[in-house]
């Protein structure tokens, strides 16, 4: 972000006084962000944002969202503030996993974004993808940890279980 964007958001985010989220995934695209449908069109000094994002961690409690959208120039990042007219975040309930994580769908209906809320110097997929490798490591480590715990529980159970007066394992 610009120095002004960093000054406005980073201190409050670091103190936990504000919450942010990262909006890249779309319901039809999943892990293929190059198939992005969310788009922004220049309108004077502002941008008009339309589309939606899905499975966004902290989306319904975020004060600011980094949202990636297709423009005539390519993909750009926009800072969408929760009180902007036309922005709506809906929490997703009854998930199969990650139930302790607040997850939401984000909707943009002619959201007017000032040029001061556009991430500078980033056009194309390099911006959003530069963040994803580290995030994906975190997800994979969690899955590996859960799988390891399941294996250990199964082994412990099979070592303790007795059927027909004989140990199962």
In which residue ranges do the predicted regions lie?
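Glycine-rich beta->alpha junctions and the first turn(s) of the following alpha-helix
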Residues: 88-169
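Short glycine/proline-enriched turns and hinge-like loops at secondary-structure junctions
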Residues: 32-34, 45, 58-62, 99-101, ...
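A short core secondary-structure module
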Residues: 50-90
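A structural signal for short hydrophobic beta-strand segments in well-ordered beta-sheet cores
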Residues: 38-41
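N-terminal glycine-rich flavin-associated loop
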Residues: 1-4, 30-33
């Amino acid at each position: 972000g610009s120095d002004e964007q960093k000054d406005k958001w980073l201190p409050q985010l670091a103190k936990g006084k504000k919450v942010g989220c990262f909006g890249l995934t779309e319901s039809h695209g999943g892990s293929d962000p190059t198939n992005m449908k969310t788009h922004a069109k220049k309108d004077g000094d502002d941008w008009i944002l339309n589309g939606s994002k899905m499975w966004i961690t902290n989306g319904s409690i975020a004060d600011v969202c980094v949202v990636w959208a297709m423009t005539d120039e390519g993909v750009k990042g926009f800072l969408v503030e929760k009180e902007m007219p036309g922005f709506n975040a809906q929490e997703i309930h009854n998930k199969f996993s990650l139930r302790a994580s607040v997850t939401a769908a984000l909707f943009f209906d002619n959201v007017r974004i000032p040029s001061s809320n556009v991430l500078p110097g980033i056009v194309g997929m390099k911006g959003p993808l530069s963040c994803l490798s580290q995030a994906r490591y975190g997800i994979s480590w969690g899955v590996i940890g859960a799988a390891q715990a399941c294996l250990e529980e199964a082994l412990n159970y099979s070592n303790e279980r007795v059927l027909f007066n004989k140990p199962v394992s």
